[in-house]
């Protein structure tokens, strides 16, 4: 009888530990942030126009050709994908769930289609990689755009400035 009680208690304890472990795993998965990365541009531009946003009457090209390196002559779409893949690897290593809008250069995706990917996966952050060009060699640095003033990833200083 003691042996049966001991086995039952062991089974209850084991099931409790399994349930606790499963709950912790579910909780960890629930907290995992989703980051969507869009490597800007692609092999071929799409010059047909589309609205710049939902309900907008203002239109622009679906995807432009992008810049090229002034020394390397590397097209922006190639550089953007290289950078995006490195960022993907780093974010995955840090525990984020990463969705890539594109993983190759020869795609046909408009800017609206790219945004729909971020919406589909309910992205916590949508990162669009670009390597902008300028007409002057004195222009240097990075450009970061956080389009909404209520964007929780913006710093207080950026909110004040926008």
Predicted regions and their residues:
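Positively charged n-region of N-terminal signal peptides that target proteins for export
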Residues: 1-9
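Sec-dependent signal peptide cleavage junction
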Residues: 17-31
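Active-site-proximal loop motif in hydrolases
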Residues: 33-34, 39-83
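Conserved, well-structured beta-alpha core segment at the onset of a catalytic domain
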Residues: 2, 25, 93
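A generic local structural motif
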Residues: 15, 22-23, 112-115
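Active-site-proximal helix/loop segments of hydrolytic enzymes
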Residues: 30, 71-162
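Membrane-proximal envelope biogenesis segments
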Residues: 13, 28, 34-36
């Amino acid at each position: 009888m003691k042996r049966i009680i001991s086995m039952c208690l062991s089974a209850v304890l084991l099931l409790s530990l399994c349930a606790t472990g499963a709950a912790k795993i579910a909780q960890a998965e629930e907290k995992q942030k989703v980051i969507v990365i869009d490597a800007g541009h692609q092999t071929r531009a799409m010059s047909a126009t589309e609205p710049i946003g939902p309900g907008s009457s203002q239109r622009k090209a679906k995807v432009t050709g992008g810049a090229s390196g002034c020394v390397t002559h590397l097209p922006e779409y190639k550089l953007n994908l290289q950078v995006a893949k490195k960022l993907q690897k780093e974010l995955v290593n840090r525990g984020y769930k990463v969705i890539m809008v594109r993983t190759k250069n020869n795609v046909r995706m408009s800017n609206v289609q790219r945004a729909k990917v971020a919406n589909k996966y309910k992205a916590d952050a949508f990162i669009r990689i670009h390597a902008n060009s300028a007409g002057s060699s004195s222009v240097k640095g990075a450009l970061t755009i956080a389009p909404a003033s209520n964007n929780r990833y913006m710093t207080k200083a950026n909110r004040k400035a926008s």
